[in-house]
């Protein structure tokens, strides 16, 4: 197992050097949703949402088809990259990297019934739909040197610990000697260098204001996700 880890670490270092030499794939960026009404949110808000969420689905093209992993991540201060880690045994960690990747960050979502738009005589021929918030971070996924892992996991846990009210933040200093190193050997660090940010905030913007307001009123009586969407639907449009 140790020999495998050493071989893998050498490969990671070689990949990092290859990226430093300005290796760059061709990345074609297409809108997540074809309707421009749902793509009016600013880059800053899309990034703020992604930073606050801190969790997404990472996907790359594998030799036998798409590979995906659900990962926590830490967005850099200037939003030029997102750092994350994967289990050594994860097929995505063994993909041919650096390479194009997509990190999909999802927010609240909920079903929309046509009945909520109003009487059929006033709003005829409506169909069910789904409202949601999602941001796609596209870029180049590269392995990081193994020595970057300790700092990454400490910064990641610190970010989320400081959000918890009412307790002293947990740190890896609480772990027994050697335990952290044993666990770190089971994961690998990666960095997504962000090339494009694409957000979809599908909130019935293609409906008249009064119709949208009725749907929001109905959603406000639903579960937490429905209420979150209702609150977003009631916000004033960005200018």
Residue ranges and their predicted role:
Residues 1-22:
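N-terminal polybasic/positive-inside topogenic patches
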Residues 21-31, 140-239:
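C-terminal edge-of-domain segments
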Residues 33-57:
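Short, basic/aromatic recognition patches
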Residues 47, 126, 179-182:
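A generic local secondary-structure boundary/capping motif
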Residues 51-54, 77-81, 92, 100, ...:
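Hydrophobic/basic alpha-helical segments enriched in Actinobacteria
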Residues 52, 67, 78, 97-98, ...:
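A short, structural micro-pattern
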Residues 52-88, 103:
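Short beta-strand segments
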Residues 88-152:
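Short, structured beta-strand-loop surface elements
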């Amino acid at each position: 197992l140790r020999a495998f880890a050493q071989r893998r670490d050498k490969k990671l270092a070689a990949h990092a050097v290859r990226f430093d030499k300005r290796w760059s794939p061709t990345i074609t960026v297409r809108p997540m949703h074809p309707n421009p009404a749902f793509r009016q949110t600013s880059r800053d808000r899309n990034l703020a949402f992604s930073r606050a969420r801190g969790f997404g689905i990472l996907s790359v093209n594998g030799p036998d088809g798409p590979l995906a992993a659900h990962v926590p991540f830490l967005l850099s201060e200037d939003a030029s990259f997102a750092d994350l880690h994967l289990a050594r045994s994860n097929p995505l960690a063994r993909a041919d990297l650096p390479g194009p990747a997509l990190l999909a960050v999802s927010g609240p979502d909920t079903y929309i019934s046509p009945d909520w738009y109003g009487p059929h005589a006033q709003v005829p021929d409506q169909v069910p739909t789904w409202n949601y918030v999602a941001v796609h971070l596209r870029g180049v996924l590269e392995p990081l040197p193994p020595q970057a892992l300790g700092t990454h996991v400490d910064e990641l846990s610190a970010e989320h610990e400081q959000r918890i009210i009412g307790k002293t933040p947990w740190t890896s200093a609480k772990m027994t000697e050697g335990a952290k190193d044993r666990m770190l050997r089971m994961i690998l660090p990666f960095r997504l260098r962000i090339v494009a940010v694409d957000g979809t905030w599908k909130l019935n913007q293609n409906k008249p204001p009064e119709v949208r307001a009725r749907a929001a009123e109905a959603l406000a009586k639903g579960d937490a996700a429905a209420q979150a969407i209702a609150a977003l639907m009631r916000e004033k449009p960005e200018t």
